């Protein structure tokens, strides 16, 4: 299941986002969206989890949680 994450702090790394979701199950991919020219974060990302049940549990657990000073906004993509 693909999960859309927004309101990411610009300093958050792929490995930090991965670490948050790994606590709730298997993660197959993590991507943080960046502007091509500047290479800076768009404050959004995608997390792919093979298990829908684990993905829904991760969304419920992480919705509104603080990560790097920003409150996460998460939904199914």
Q: What is each model feature region?
A:
Residues 1-76:
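Canonical RRM/RBD RNA-binding surface and closely related RRM-like beta-sheet modules
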